[in-house]
Amino acid sequence: MSVLQVLTFPDDRLRTVAKPVDAVTPEIQKIVDDMIETMYDEEGIGLAATQVDIHKRIVVIDISETRDEPMVLINPEILEKRGEDGIEEGCLSVPGARALVPRAAEVTVKALDRDGKEFTFEADDLLAICVQHELDHLQGKLFVDYLSPLKRKRIQDKLAKIKRFNEKQQNA
């Protein structure tokens, strides 16, 4: 398994709409395994393939406290949304930024697992929010897109400043 590089906002590749997975092959399973390792390495609770420059409809999520219950969603689709919720969200592709995003409180989701078997599940609370956040990535959408242009610009400027600082540190 390998840790993959996570793209950061405003990288245009994050805006790519992911394509469906035609078949769950050993190559797809390796991508899934690498994504899980990357999610854990980055201390995230979810990761979409788009975030690691793989434009396929693959998401991994683990909201467990023990960090050992990864959920794999291949070609995920939200069948139903119910209620309203929202929490202050963060994102591995927008490091250091958090914002309140409106989401459905509950969702019904259909997907394929790591072995290509179809399953359907109900999600609420943090899992419902995480699923919606990660599926947004597959559509080329980020949580900052829900914010005002001013807030989005502030986040972009902050990330650019952090990037410049890190580059200076590496060159020193």
Swiss-Prot record:
Keywords: Hydrolase, Iron, Metal-binding, Protein biosynthesis. It is an enzyme of class 3 (hydrolase). Its EC number is 3.5.1.88. Binds 1 Fe(2+) ion. CDD domains: Pep_deformylase. GO terms for biological process: co-translational protein modification; translation. Removes the formyl group from the N-terminal Met of newly synthesized proteins. Requires at least a dipeptide for an efficient rate of reaction. N-terminal L-methionine is a prerequisite for activity but the enzyme has broad specificity at other positions. This is Peptide deformylase 1. It comes from Vibrio parahaemolyticus serotype O3:K6 (strain RIMD 2210633). The lineage of its organism: Bacteria, Pseudomonadati, Pseudomonadota, Gammaproteobacteria, Vibrionales.
